[in-house]
């Protein structure tokens, strides 16, 4: 069997171009927002898609995008933050208590280790809020209250941030 390396390279380039166009169209269809992070531009694209889907209650799609951002940048704390919130579906009554903990533990075994991967105070605040949600024992109501209290601290520090 004959192989054509140039053809394979051309096919790979075309796939990349098409994928980029699909991502741009997909991003456009879920709205626009500004959620800057310390992630690489490649990971940021998937992170923003994840946030868009999360805001649109597309939990499965959001989870996929956050995991893609993690594949691109394994220590991208905000991608784990986002995934943490894809396991709670408030409108259909689904609640998975274990997966948010598992998600954050993939980023780091301890809070200190996880926070060391969040390079800005803003990202540390978001990550602390996700930890409050994931690791507070008890009902989903208790977890949401812990998350709300932690987010009030983020708001106090970054009140001009729309997120």
Feature-to-residue mapping (PLM):
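Alpha-helical tetratricopeptide repeat
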Residues: 40-54, 81, 125-127
């Amino acid at each position: 069997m004959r192989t054509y390396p140039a053809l394979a390279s051309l096919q790979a380039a075309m796939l990349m171009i098409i994928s980029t166009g699909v991502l741009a169209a997909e991003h456009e269809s879920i709205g626009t927002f500004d959620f800057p992070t310390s992630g690489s531009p490649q990971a940021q694209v998937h992170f923003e898609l994840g946030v868009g889907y999360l805001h649109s209650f597309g939990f499965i799609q959001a989870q996929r995008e956050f995991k893609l951002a993690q594949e691109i940048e394994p220590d991208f704390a905000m991608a784990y933050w986002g995934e943490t919130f894809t396991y709670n579906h408030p409108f259909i009554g689904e609640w998975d208590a274990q997966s948010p903990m598992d998600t954050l533990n993939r980023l780091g075994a301890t809070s200190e280790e996880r926070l060391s991967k969040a390079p800005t105070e803003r990202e540390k605040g978001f990550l602390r809020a996700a930890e409050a949600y994931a690791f507070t024992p008890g009902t989903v109501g208790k977890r949401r209250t812990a998350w709300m209290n932690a987010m009030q601290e983020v708001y106090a520090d970054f009140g001009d941030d729309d997120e």
